[in-house]
Amino acid sequence: MCAEVYHCAGFIASDPVQFPHRYTLKQDIEISGLLTAIMSFGNRKQILKKADELHKLMGTSPYQYVLSRRWEEDFPSGATHSFYRMLSYADFHGYFRRLYTAYTQFGSLEDALNIYSGIPMEKLCAFLEVSAKSPQKKLNMFLRWMIRRDSEVDLGIWESFDRRDLIVPLDT
């Protein structure tokens, strides 16, 4: 029953995965997917509302937004007030700064992650400078979106990672 409900095209419109599905360029999908996944906690309606606000700021191409550095004005590095729940404008500045570095040095986030060792989750945590020891459910969801190809929901655009290396974090 779960697969019929959550792994079909009809699910996309009501889920945060709708945002990366709006794009065709790999870099746009990566940026949209990562930032949307990072925000995916709390009330679903609030997640979708705030993710929509973020995507309006980024305009038609998250990739061009990152490269243009407009995020430096929209998300000042010293701004500690909240953008979404406990995520501050400064937090998003840090995410955009890491993405800017990745895209100016590598062709994609996928390529940037490959400089790190370990399974995909460890690589992504190293890139974001967060602990790989916590469950990181949102980041695992992002990796699923990028790596899995066996669902209408997941985008499956990353070729260099194996879906067998994905993990399902459990609450303890």
Regions found by a protein language model. Name each.
Residues 1-172:
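HhH-family (HhH-GPD) DNA N-glycosylase catalytic core used in base-excision repair
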